[in-house]
């Protein structure tokens, strides 16, 4: 996992591969170029960069014994943490000495190249021909409020719940010279999710996505991380340059033996299909999610999107369960929560979903809302009031309580009691396959469960559709993938699923779908769903391999 600074350390062979993709190669006179590393860490990127720079300098006639200090403008690296900066500086100087640079020049370059500063706020001296790195992965809640406000004022891409790596992209893209290239290894979340929209739009308007390498299920870092990385290479095109397709590679083995030929294939004049590289046009399209799957899969998704309504257009509702802000206080055993009956609801949690059905463990959640959506008058519920008072310190410490001091006991999300009594489908966030459970209308969903209700569709029949490979096709096209091949079955991705209106489903097929769901028969669900969508054999094969 990232350390407390958001740092994740990158394997040497991955760094070398990124440098090859952006064109930072020794055949060029690298001393005449300018490279930026925005988050130096312990110099994972800088050491290979320095090796290439020095060897290129010598190959192009440079004299290390006299002219090494002329390399000063070639690199600029930033690091905000002093201990990391000192570590990076010491290994940089040691590497320069190993390469034949004299001590005084090596010390001078270490000071010139490495700058201690907050990269997002530091003044930058000029534009750069290359930007490479592994930007820090820090969630907003870990950034001090005053600093976060300054970042928000400065960076248009710091939108919604965007993590810190997003403004790193923006700042680095802003300082790319014409023809310059950025090569980052980073989580791929921003390429598909909501908060990545403004950054995707920025790339679409001003830049070109030249290369994308999907690193799902690979060991690109020196420690295990949950969210899967990808390499993105983005170029600021020179004036009047022609648009080019994106070259894409999928899940290469992490080794120099693989990366060397792959880099040549990805950067060569002609496309070498045998190397596992594909070209895709139209990947970048305004703020729309990037779809980087094979063309036949994309064509199937587009066909279904053009001919069928979304789940919600077909009369279904997709939502997420309640977040309380302190589950230890708001959730307890339903029988022993000492509050009035109307002030608690039986709760469905991920732990209650077993083997495709509900095995309720008896937990309940406090309900501070009346049916009309107003918070309750505590004077009318003395037991509830006493319970809240007993836990007032923890309750008032929540962010939502500080924002709403008069309604300090409300949950983060409003609770709609009628939802507990409504039949629904429950979907855990992270699953390898669509793990859809029917709940007959007795439980309220917890915040790690998504729910689907339906006005038109028979929920059991809809369960069969969502159990099928077609659901995974849609969600997998738009969702980020987690370790082990798990997909995020979140509301924003569930809403992408297309289904016909229930009235347009033939009666025999309605029956077949329902029976498949009740039996928990995934194969039968697939057969009926293939018929529902009119998939031909080739399209069925695509769905089967998702």
Swiss-Prot record:
Query: What biological process terms from GO does the record include?
Result: DNA restriction-modification system; methylation
Database matches in Gene3D superfamilies: Vaccinia Virus protein VP39 (3.40.50.150)
Source taxon at top rank: Bacteria
Pfam families named in the record: Eco57I (PF07669), TaqI_C (PF12950)
Reactions accelerated catalytically: a 2'-deoxyadenosine in DNA + S-adenosyl-L-methionine = an N(6)-methyl-2'-deoxyadenosine in DNA + S-adenosyl-L-homocysteine + H(+)
Which InterPro entries does this UniProt record tie to the protein?
DNA_methylase_N6_adenine_CS (IPR002052), MethylTrfase_TaqI-like_dom (IPR011639), N4_N6_ade-DNA_methylase (IPR050953), SAM-dependent_MTases_sf (IPR029063), TaqI_C (IPR025931)
GO-annotated molecular function: DNA binding; site-specific DNA-methyltransferase (adenine-specific) activity
What EC number(s) does its UniProt record assign? Answer: 2.1.1.72
Q: Which family does it belong to?
A: Belongs to the N(4)/N(6)-methyltransferase family.
Q: What is this protein called?
A: Type II methyltransferase M.XhoI
- To which species is this protein native? Xanthomonas vasicola
């Amino acid at each position: 996992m990232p350390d407390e600074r958001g740092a994740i350390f990158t394997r040497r062979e991955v760094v070398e591969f990124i440098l090859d993709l952006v064109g930072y190669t020794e055949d060029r006179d690298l001393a005449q170029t300018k490279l930026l590393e925005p988050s130096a860490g312990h110099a994972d990127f800088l050491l290979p960069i320095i090796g290439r720079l020095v060897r290129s300098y010598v190959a192009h006639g440079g004299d290390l014994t006299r002219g090494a200090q002329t390399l000063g403008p070639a690199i600029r690296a930033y690091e905000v943490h002093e201990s990391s900066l000192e570590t990076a500086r010491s290994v940089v100087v040691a590497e320069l000495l190993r390469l034949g640079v004299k001590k005084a020049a090596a010390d001078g370059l270490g000071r010139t190249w490495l700058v201690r500063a907050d990269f997002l706020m530091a003044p930058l001296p000029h534009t750069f021909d290359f930007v490479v790195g592994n930007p820090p992965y820090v969630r907003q809640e870990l950034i001090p409020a005053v600093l976060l406000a300054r970042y928000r004022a400065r960076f248009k891409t710091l939108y919604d719940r965007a993590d810190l790596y997003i403004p790193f992209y923006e700042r680095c893209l802003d300082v790319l010279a014409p023809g310059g290239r950025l090569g980052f290894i980073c989580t791929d979340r921003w390429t598909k999710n909501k908060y990545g929209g403004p950054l995707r739009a920025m790339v679409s308007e001003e830049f070109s996505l030249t290369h994308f390498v999907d690193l799902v299920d690979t060991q690109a870092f020196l420690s295990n991380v949950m969210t899967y990385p990808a390499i993105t290479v983005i170029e600021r095109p020179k004036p009047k340059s022609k648009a080019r397709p994106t070259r894409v590679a999928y899940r290469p083995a992490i080794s120099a033996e693989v990366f060397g030929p792959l880099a040549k294939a990805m950067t060569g004049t002609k496309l070498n299909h045998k190397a596992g590289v594909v070209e895709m046009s139209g990947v970048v399209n305004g703020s729309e999610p990037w779809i980087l799957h094979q063309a036949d899969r994309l064509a199937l998704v587009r066909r279904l999107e053009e001919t069928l309504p979304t789940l919600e257009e077909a009369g279904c509702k997709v939502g997420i369960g309640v977040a309380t802000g302190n589950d230890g206080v708001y959730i307890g055993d339903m029988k022993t929560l000492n509050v009035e009956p109307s002030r608690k609801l039986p709760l469905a949690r991920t732990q209650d979903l077993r083997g495709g059905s509900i095995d309720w463990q008896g937990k309940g959640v406090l309900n501070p809302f009346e049916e009309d959506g107003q918070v309750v008058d505590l004077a009318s519920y003395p037991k509830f009031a006493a319970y809240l008072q007993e836990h007032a310190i923890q309750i008032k410490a929540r962010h939502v309580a500080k924002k709403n001091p008069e309604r300090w006991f409300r949950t983060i999300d409003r609770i709609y009691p009628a939802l507990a009594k409504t039949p629904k489908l429950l979907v855990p966030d992270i699953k390898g396959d669509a793990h859809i459970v029917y709940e007959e209308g007795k439980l309220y969903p917890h915040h790690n469960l998504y729910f689907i209700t339906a006005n038109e569709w028979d929920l059991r029949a809809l369960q069969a559709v969502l159990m099928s490979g077609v659901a995974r096709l849609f969600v997998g096209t738009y969702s980020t993938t987690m370790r082990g091949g798990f997909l995020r079955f979140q509301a924003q991705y569930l809403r992408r699923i297309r289904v016909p209106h229930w009235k347009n489903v033939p009666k025999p097929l309605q029956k077949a779908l329902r029976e498949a769901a009740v039996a928990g028969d995934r194969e039968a669900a697939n057969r009926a769903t293939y018929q529902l969508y009119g998939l031909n054999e080739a399209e069925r094969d695509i769905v089967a391999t998702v």
